[in-house]
Amino acid sequence: MSTATQSKVVGYLPQDRPPVGKMLLLGFQHVITMFPATVLCALLMHFNVSTVLFVTGLGTIVALLGAKWSMGNYIPLYYGSSFSYIAAVTMVINQLEPGLAFGQPASAATISVVQTGFIATGVINIIVGLIIRLTGGKAGVDKVLPPIITGSVAIVIGIGLGFAALGMASGTCCVPADAYTPQVSLTWWAVSTLTLVITILLSVYLQGKGFIGMLPILLGAVAGFLIAIPFGLVQPSFPSALITPPTFTFPDFTNPLTLSVMISVGIMAIATIPESTAHLYQISLYVDHLAEEQGREKLGLSKFIGLNLMLDGLDDLVNGLFGSTAGTNYGENNSLMVITRNYSGVVLITAGAIAMILGFLGPLRDAVNVVPTAVWGGLAIYLYGVIGMQGIALMIAEKVDLYDPGKLAIGACILIIGIGGTIGYPNGLPIPLLTGVFPFGWPPIATAALFGILMNLIFLAFKPPVVRGTDVLE
């Protein structure tokens, strides 16, 4: 097995195996990096934190081994919970089990129905990956899912969750109306706002500061927890047993809502496909740069776009089979690898194993549950906003022409249908069609995405006239 000790340049390529001690420490760093977002995502979607930690670790290992089996090397990516599915999942859970408090896990029966949506997501990713592998590129997929659609859907996902974030930050989501006094309101706002501001400052001023720069969300949550103590928002809890097995659930394809869930949740894959592709390009660039510095052969991981999406789908199948949230490869773990120059696949497998072990620790779950909702609300304002801004960043990076009336129309309709529907019709748009499939109403984000895809296909089939610049005036 080749190791980085063969070169004077420090760093580990995907095929390298560090010594055991370093391997454990580097793996634990990955777990700490993915922990805040993965846990928060589980709490927001009413999934069991311990189960999500265990299964995301398992999914990461399965994806890494799948790459090793398929191409003879690892694609160094860590899979955690995806925020792109929060709106679609919470809509389904609110239909099946309304009134759940923040962080309260849904029943096994409810989670089993949601899991079918993650199975659908996995299948979609695998199909798209196969198409790319067979056609030799992603140009065909970009025609059906251009950046104006994927970027607009990302904006909808983030901004559409704004109302929920403000409810958590203010306490209106959780405090009974008769107990919601001005003093209570001020207390919640104080804790959530201070948490938000501290987290933003940490994100801005710790960037580029090494490993600690990867932990602004975790540090912000700790700071918010400490702030909440004198405000009386921290409620003590009795510790669980040291070893508490995760609660595994399995997909329920017999529920009458299964088809509706598979459509409304599964289509969210269109938001994660461009994200995953961008992460692969990023990590491929840095891996090849390190290989060049070490005088070793470049791996060219960027040419495995199709395989990477198939592995994403494989990870989602694992999540959907055992009761975790839908996954995505984490940009924060990519950044950690760039900073530490450690791209070892074995280290990532070690990280997955550590996450699986943490899933059995009862006190860890207790520590997460004792953090006040106001603290999570402050973090949610920031994180949800970032999701929306990433959609804008995607369109800027892809140079989307918003002076093109077709693209402008697609983006405009996706935003209004998606955001307006998510906030105004949280249980679904009141469209009296296909009521057997969508008994509570059409899922807003899925409806917005499908409308955008349909309009784009019309424009592809019937090319509109190209009018630019002064031609408009003439």
Descriptions of predicted regions:
Residues 92-94, 333-348, 354-358:
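Interfacial segments of multi-pass membrane proteins
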Residues 2-13, 17, 201-202, 216-267, ...:
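Hydrophobic transmembrane alpha-helices of multi-pass solute/ion transporters
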Residues 47-53, 71-85, 142-149, 213-218, ...:
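Short, non-helical or kinked segments that cap or interrupt transmembrane helices
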Residues 21-37, 184-199, 215-216, 229-233, ...:
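Hydrophobic, membrane-embedded alpha-helices of multi-pass small-molecule transporters
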Residues 13-14, 20, 43-72, 267-345:
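Membrane-embedded helical hairpins/re-entrant loop segments and their flanking transmembrane helices
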Residues 1-25, 175, 179, 238-249, ...:
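Intrinsically disordered, low-complexity non-transmembrane regions of multi-pass membrane transporters
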Residues 1-77, 84-108:
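N-terminal signal-anchor module of multipass membrane proteins
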Residues 109-236, 350-469:
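Membrane-embedded alpha-helical modules
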